[in-house]
Amino acid sequence: MSIIKNNFEKMNITKIKNSKNNKKLTVITAYDALFAKLFEEIADMILVGDSLNMSFAGRPDTLSATLEQMIYHTNAVCNGAKNAFVIIDMPFGTYINKDEALKNCVEVYRQTNANAVKIEGGEDKADIIKHLTSNAVAVMGHIGLMPQYVRSEGGYKVRGKTKEDEEQLIRDAIAVEKAGAFSIVVEGVKSDVAKKITQAVNIPIIGIGAGVDTDGQVLVWSDMLGFFEEFKPKFVRHYLDGAELVKEAVNQYRNDVQDKSFPSKEEEY
């Protein structure tokens, strides 16, 4: 299947906001220059997610990701995808109050070419988000199932199952929008509730495990390409059996080495 490239035009905050009700946004994670370069002219935005702590570093959750780690990977992504709109997840513990949040976001802006930061939290984080946006930091919000809360909430739990939770999620989205966020990730939320959230605000809602009626979708690249074999969330679609293809290729390489068919005369100096 050939890849049809449209005339590539880098996204910015205005274009992202204007996509509401006009264009479905495609967001994908990346953690290094190689994959970022592959994705940059296809996806609308690249997220350097703290999910790298799991899929890249092999940790059980995202909580031990550090700011230094996120800055390192964001620089790698920006080096590989110089024209992409890049968002960095602010890791757990880096935005516990207004001053700490601003200090760490300024450090991100100084050390990387990231276009925006992403912060988990709703009404409880609205004051912090407002402080950041008032000081020229572009913020993407994140509500619903929030991976940085996994230990305090006892696991990954789908949100929006009760009327009370539905109303809280809508309040969260409205509060984050009023605080100045340009977009919000809504994760692990019942699809009918995610649709109501999308309709309740004027900024794009990017869904992950939140149904088809959001303004766009985000997936972790290793999930989407079938590299993570241990577990497949219900909301993930494998567009490639990446793990099997890689193992087959490496196995063939090993066989070629053992039977001396690699390198060939054509591959020698």
Swiss-Prot record:
Subcellular location: Cytoplasm
Record-linked PANTHER family: 3-METHYL-2-OXOBUTANOATE HYDROXYMETHYLTRANSFERASE
Binding of 3-methyl-2-oxobutanoate, residues: D50, S51, D89, K118
Active site per the UniProt annotation: E187 (proton acceptor)
Needed co-factor(s): Mg(2+)
GO biological process per UniProt: pantothenate biosynthetic process
Alphabetized UniProt keyword annotations: Cytoplasm, Magnesium, Metal-binding, Pantothenate biosynthesis, Transferase
Description of how the protein assembles with itself and partners: Homodecamer; pentamer of dimers.
Function text: Catalyzes the reversible reaction in which hydroxymethyl group from 5,10-methylenetetrahydrofolate is transferred onto alpha-ketoisovalerate to form ketopantoate.
SUPFAM superfamilies with a match to the protein in the record: Phosphoenolpyruvate/pyruvate domain
An MF annotation (GO) of this entry: magnesium ion binding
Source taxon at top rank: Bacteria
Enzyme nomenclature, EC number: 2.1.2.11
A Pfam family of this chain: Pantoate_transf
Protein name, per record: 3-methyl-2-oxobutanoate hydroxymethyltransferase
Gene3D superfamilies: Phosphoenolpyruvate-binding domains
Species in which this protein is naturally found: Aliarcobacter butzleri (strain RM4018) (Arcobacter butzleri)
Cofactor binding note of this UniProt entry: Binds 1 Mg(2+) ion per subunit.
Catalytic activity: 3-methyl-2-oxobutanoate + (6R)-5,10-methylene-5,6,7,8-tetrahydrofolate + H2O = 2-dehydropantoate + (6S)-5,6,7,8-tetrahydrofolate
Pathway: Cofactor biosynthesis; (R)-pantothenate biosynthesis; (R)-pantoate from 3-methyl-2-oxobutanoate: step 1/2
Binding site for Mg(2+): D50, D89, E120
GO annotations of cellular component type: cytoplasm
